[in-house]
Structure formats: C-alpha cells, structure tokens
Amino acid sequence: MTDQEEAKLILDKLNEKIRYHDLLYYTQDSPEISDAEYDDLCHQRSIILEKFPSLNSYYQDYIGGDPDSRFSKVKHNERMLSLDNAFNKQDVEKFMVRTRKLLDMKENESLCFSCELKIDGLSFSIIYKNGKLFQASTRGNGYFGENITNNVKTIENLPHTIQNAPDFLEVRGEVYIDRNDFIQLNNEGKNFANPRNAAAGSIRQLDPTITAQRKLKYCMYTIVNSNCLTQTESLNLLNSWGFCTNEHTISTDNFEEAINFYNKMYNNRSNISYDIDGIIYKINNIKLQHILGTTSKSPRWAIAYKFPAIEGKTKLNKISIQVGRTGVLTPIAELAPINIGGVVITRASLHNKSEIERKDIREGDYVIVKRAGDVIPQVVDVDKSLRTVELAEFNFPTACPACGSTVYQAQQEVSIYCMGGLFCHNQILEKIRHFVSKDAFNIIGLGKKQLLFFYEYGLITNIIDIFTLEEKINNKNIQLSSFNGWGEKSINNLLSAINNSKVINLENFIFSLGIRFVGKHIAKILANHFISYKNWYTEMLKLAQDVNYTINIQQVGLKTINSLRTFFIEQHNLNMINNLVEHLTIIDAQSNSYVSLIHGKTIVFTGELSSMSRSEAKLKSETAGAKVSSSLSKNTDFLIIGNNPGSKYKKAQSLNIQILSEDIWLQYIQPNKV
C-alpha cells in the first residue's frame, strides 16, 4: 500500500469522525468532545491534505451540519463559510504573511485588519426585501440552512423594517445568550451544557413563543455583497440601519497592536456578559477580500485566533475510575461544584495514571480545573499551598473495577486497560455495537436502542446471545410485539438478519472482535495471510502461550502483535470465540491463486434470490473476487436476476449488460485452483 493510499484510509476515518461531531454540535447542540479536540481532528486532516494535494478533490469540505429535518430548508445565495483557526501568535503571523504574499504586496505597503470578537453563539443570515424582513436561516451545512424566520422575529431590538436599504439585502451575524440569562434558564429547569447550546436550542424551537421567552441577543458582523469599501464602513452602515454590532472592534495595520487587542480581550473576557472564544482578524479592505477569495471551506481573508480554555479552582473530593468501551481505565475527578464560564462543573478528566503521579494529585486536594475548548473539563494542576494536612497518595486499581479482570499497561503507553474484553459489562454494549456494525457482522436492525432493550431484559448480555436470541425469546415466552417499537415485521427482519449473518468472511470476523489496533485494514491483512480461521486461531494460541513467539507480517507491527497476544491470553476471550464459532460458517480469505468466472467483474443483483439472502449473495460474490454494486452503469459486467426483478432488468437490456440467472451465477462463483 502506498503512502497516499494509507493517507486516504486515515482521511476516511477523520472525515467520518468530523461529520459525526458536526452533527452533534451544529444540529443537535450536544457536543461530545471539546472544541480543542475537534480542532485537532480538523488540523490532522489539513496536514494530510497539505501533504497529498491530489486528495483535496476527493474530499468535499462540509461546513457545520446538515439542516435539522424539522425545519424547512433554505438555500443560501452565497455559501456561509466557517473560519480557519489560529492557536498561537505565530499562526496569526503566518496568516498575515501569507495574505500579503497572495496580494503581491511590497514590504512597505500597509495592510489594515478589522479586529472583532468571536462570539460563541450560532451564526445566522437574514434577507430583507424592499426593506422588510423576508427570511432568516441558520448556517446549516453552508449550502442549506434551517428556516428560522418566525423565531428570529422574536429577538429584541432586531429590525423588522429598514429605512433607506437596497431592495435586496442580506446580513449575517451571531445569535447568543448572556451568561446570567443562561444560568437563570437552567435554574428554571432547563439542562443546557453552556450558553452556546442554549442559544442554538432556543433559536431552533418549533414554537416561536418559547424562543421569545429565552432573552436571546444578536450581533451583526457582515453585509453580503456590500458596496462598502471597508469592513469598518459595513459595520457603521449596519449600525445606521438599527442593527446591533459589537462595540469591542478596532482596525489596525500594526501586527503587535492586533495581538495586544487579543490579549486585552482575553484578560477582560470575564467582564463581558457573554461568552467569547477568540478574536477574528479580517482584511479591512473589501476589494482585497474579493481578490483573495475563498477555499471550499473558509475565506482566505480572515482567521479566528482562539482563546485558551477557562480555568477555576475547586476541591477534589474523590477519584473514581471509568471503564470505556475500549477497556481504558480513565480516572475521573469528582469535584466540589464550580462555575466555569457559566457552566457548573462537578467532574473532570484526570487523563491517566501517569498524569496523577506526575502532578501528585490526591483526594482532598484543591485543583485547577480547565474547560478545554470551553466544553470538556480537565484537571491541569494542584495548588499544593492549600494541602494543609497529609493526604494519601492515590493507588490505581490492579483489577478492573467493573468486572474484576486483570489490568495491564503496554510498554511505552500511558493508558491502562482491562483485559476482560467482552466479559467486562462496562465494555460489552459498545463492544456488541462494534460486533454488529456494517464492517463486522452487519446485523441490520440491531442498533444502540435495540441492544439496550435486549440488554435490560437479559436477552443479549454477550455476543453469543445474539445467535440464541430467538430461542431465548421463545423459552422466556416474551411477546416482543407487545413492546413499543416492535412489530411482527421488524422482529422477523431482525431474526432473519441475525440468521443471514452467520455466514461471514474471515476478515470481517477478525474485525468484529474489537481487538485493539486491529481495524479493518489490519484484519484484512491477517485474513489474507492466514487464509483460514483454523490457521489464524492456531497462530494466535501460539502467541498467547509463548511470550517469545511472534509473527512476521508486513504492516503488522509490534503493538498489534502484543495486543493480539494480550487478547488471547485472557481465558474469557478464548471461551467466547470457541462458543461463537459453533454458530458460524467462516469463509476462508481468497488466496492469490483464486479465480472464478466473475473474478474482477462488477455485478448487480435485482429481484429475490431463492437460495440465499441478498447479503449472503453479496458476500459469496465478493469472496469469489467480484465487486458488488447497488446501481447499474456502463461499467457493470453482469446483472444477476432473481424472482420478480425490478426496473434494473430493463435498464440492463438497454445498456447491453449480460444478464445471468441465479443458477448460472451459482456456477460462475465456483472457485477454481490454477
């Protein structure tokens, strides 16, 4: 595999993570990670795309998240872009140097910047027609936003009509909520994580009367396609029309003055009634903005210099251990409640055992808590001057607090892991979710909600239970159809999906076990190397039984080998695998000498097959070396038809694609050794 192919695999994973967190942040207003962690994901992607520019055309930059389906969509006349971020003074300087270079400016030519607060709220756009408010929308994914017109009309001091405005006017700004209003909102029984989420959730209410009660504020920052000469002039014009703009704005052509403005606002941020998370630097000259243009994601003429996280001091009452789905034991600080940036913090991450020892953190200490990215709190230091009595050192557990299994710490790693694997109930639900996922057993209809249901009723408490589910339901005389969400069709579909999944290829089986460092790519390498389940299992037992035994496979490193060894040392995992394979047919990986009549061909299925399910047919075809597609094209080699074929049959005839019956296809997939 080439470096670029490996980079593409990494980018696939990064994009999947980024889109997932975009959905949580922009659409559901419930982020799971900090701004800093999200920025790091985007930064990793930028580094790879910079190294492999040809991959840029393969990946479309999405902005934000897709519009909430509860609201009608609004197509933006011009894309609502996001901003590139700077995290230190050097990043800002690089931006300014790059900008001057793009503009082909001489050293003695001045370049003026507008310096504005980055308010932590929700971006929105308003269109006025003939001076009257016509439509308001969120940013959404940059192309389409959500129609929030009626909600925006409830915001105090926002003009519904404008005097002396052009016939068509689009302005953009930020909706936010003051910290005190946010605290009051939560005191009234709401449960927003922070002011930004409160503002975003309030503006997305289906009932505008609820929005009207939320004391939302706004700040306008741009006129789309403005005839103004400068950003400063645009802000003044917005003011003259009656819009709120931010008073904390300066323009300067001096780099140090721009940085001083950042430092001043960072130091005074607690005196501002609303949350800000950085300073935005914009080229002040609008003509130069147009010359610089944009990338697919952000303008080249602006950058956001992000603030570091907010900190506070409180007492650490207790250190508890949380066991994650990968088995990592994460120490958690149970804190005396502290309000940081308008959010009451009671728990914070201590990262790992090494961090506790390095910082000498003890129960009863007063600790410095930081909200990384203003979202996820973590303990960053201890105020030992307040340690007036002798406090006991914290002893990290030597057994998993959830299941009692042995814990281990790999060489050159800081994390400590539970060896319980699928025996550990804290890990089990997430492990099972991985087990049934698309790239593993691909059991459709067994998602998070369904798994939790079966787990709570004791029907699926380990992966073996999946394949005895029907028997358990019958033995316990449980009428699934009497429960909400379970109809006869959904039950039959699920049981059928489970039954079909019992035929699985070796690489998917290896991947399904969720062994650390064994992702899709490594699982495929292992499968292609060992060919059969028996060969693979035998070698894994050798690894577990002899610490000096190893396997030599290209791209399978020492970390992966040690992880495999650790997994197979644990008797719980061996018992699980041995019980599991009794329910399965594990298809050997295709060797290099394997050929069939459909090897290397692109095929499509239509109609209902009589001998097997569609998913099983897909697996058998792929094992025989074919590529299975869901749609016909001029590149399709064969269309396989079952009973009651659909419209693909006629389309295949019109495209002169060869059509095979199910019986002929079964002959074509037979392997031949050469």
From Swiss-Prot:
InterPro entries with a match to the protein in the record: BRCT_dom, BRCT_dom_sf, DisA/LigA_HHH, DNA_ligase, DNA_ligase_AS, DNAligase_adenylation, DNAligase_N, NA-bd_OB-fold
Family to which the UniProt record says this protein belongs: Belongs to the NAD-dependent DNA ligase family. LigA subfamily.
Pfam family, one: DNA_ligase_OB
Catalytic residues as annotated in Swiss-Prot or TrEMBL: K118 (n6-amp-lysine intermediate)
GO biological process entries: DNA repair; DNA replication
Enzyme class: ligase
Residues that hold Zn(2+) according to the record: C400, C403, C418, C424
Organism of derivation: Ehrlichia ruminantium (strain Welgevonden)
E.C. numbers: 6.5.1.2
Domain BRCT: 593-674
Record's function text: DNA ligase that catalyzes the formation of phosphodiester linkages between 5'-phosphoryl and 3'-hydroxyl groups in double-stranded DNA using NAD as a coenzyme and as the energy source for the reaction. It is essential for DNA replication and repair of damaged DNA.
Residues binding NAD(+), per UniProt: D35, A36, E37, Y38, D39, S82, L83, E116, R139, E174, K282, K306
Record key words, sorted: DNA damage, DNA repair, DNA replication, Ligase, Magnesium, Manganese, Metal-binding, NAD, Zinc
GO cellular component: cytosol
GO terms for MF: DNA ligase (NAD+) activity; metal ion binding
Protein name, entry field: DNA ligase
Lineage of origin: Bacteria, Pseudomonadati, Pseudomonadota, Alphaproteobacteria, Rickettsiales
Reactions it catalyzes: NAD(+) + (deoxyribonucleotide)n-3'-hydroxyl + 5'-phospho-(deoxyribonucleotide)m = (deoxyribonucleotide)n+m + AMP + beta-nicotinamide D-nucleotide
The protein's required cofactors: Mg(2+); Mn(2+)
